[in-house]
């Protein structure tokens, strides 16, 4: 939504001074989108976090306190959160990447209907909701979402998180939207593919994006392929549906 507002035709002709503060969720908020929106409206835009199973919010950056760009902020009142090992489930210290789990009065007690009991048991343990999101907490208690567990790209022995690559792509001001996915190979490994929507009336090339990634990323994190699209598939709340991008790739190979 914020990207759409930033890019709306004649948006500067509208009176936007009534916008004082907004919160973004549902998908990672690119820093470039945040900065453009705040410059446009003179209001505050902060990133938060939540999920349907948490009714639906657990974290937010303070609107007028310490805001850390690129993070989801701190847990809201009466909510606990921590990072646990992706394999063992053991608590991890600050600075270590693992799975975000949350606990509080807003957490669901389960899914409606007995057919979902096994699914609920897999993500609810001792009152903690296992979010399926890979994250890290800093020394100030601010959390940063790295990736969905299922979206993490395994290339050789390395883990690549889509957001890290997408943030680099957004450094090119000709990029309107970007989404990065892992494309499966016959040997079980994945290659990194980026889908990019260029800004209208620009001369964006794949070569300049690859060159940018090579300057800013480790070699194993550089996309092996970039595909330009007019639009990216999204849910009704504006979240990019990565699975549809990978399904398109699979269909094309059949």
Predicted segments, located by residue:
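Gly/Ser/Thr-rich phosphate-binding loop
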Residues: 6-67, 80
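Glycine-centered tight turns that cap/initiate beta-strands
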Residues: 10, 18, 42, 78, ...
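Acidic/polar alpha-helix N-cap and adjacent early helical turns
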Residues: 248-254
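Beta-strand->loop->alpha-helix junctions that form or flank phosphate-binding loops
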Residues: 46-53, 73-75, 181-184, 227
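Conserved ATP/PPi-binding loop(s) of AMP-dependent carboxylate-activating enzymes
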Residues: 74-78, 90-122, 158-160
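AMP-binding/adenylate-forming catalytic core of the ANL superfamily
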Residues: 104, 109-110, 118, 132-221, ...
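Alpha-helix capping/helix-boundary segments
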Residues: 1-2, 29, 107
């Amino acid at each position: 939504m914020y990207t759409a507002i930033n890019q709306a035709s004649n948006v500067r002709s509208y009176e936007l001074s009534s916008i004082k503060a907004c919160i973004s969720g549902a998908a990672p908020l690119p820093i470039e989108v945040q900065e453009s929106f705040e410059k446009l409206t003179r209001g505050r835009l902060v990133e938060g976090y939540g999920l349907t199973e948490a009714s639906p919010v657990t974290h937010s950056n303070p609107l007028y306190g310490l805001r850390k760009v690129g993070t989801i902020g701190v847990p809201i009142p009466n909510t606990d959160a921590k990072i646990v090992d992706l394999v063992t489930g053991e608590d991890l210290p600050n600075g270590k990447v693992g799975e975000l789990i949350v606990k509080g009065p807003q957490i669901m007690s389960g899914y409606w209907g007995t057919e979902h009991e096994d699914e609920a048991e897999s993500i609810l343990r001792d009152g903690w909701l296992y979010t399926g999101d890979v994250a890290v907490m800093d020394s100030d208690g601010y959390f940063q979402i790295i990736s969905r567990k299922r979206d993490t790209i395994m290339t050789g022995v390395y883990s690549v998180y889509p957001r890290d690559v997408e943030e680099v792509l957004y450094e090119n001001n000709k990029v309107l939207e970007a989404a990065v996915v892992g494309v499966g190979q016959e040997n079980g490994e994945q290659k990194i593919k980026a889908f990019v929507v260029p800004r209208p009336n620009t001369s964006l090339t794949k070569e300049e994006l690859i060159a940018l990634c090579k300057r800013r990323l480790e070699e194993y994190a550089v996309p092996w392929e970039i595909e330009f699209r007019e639009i990216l598939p999204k849910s009704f709340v504006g979240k990019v549906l990565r699975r549809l991008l990978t399904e398109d790739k699979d269909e094309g190979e059949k």
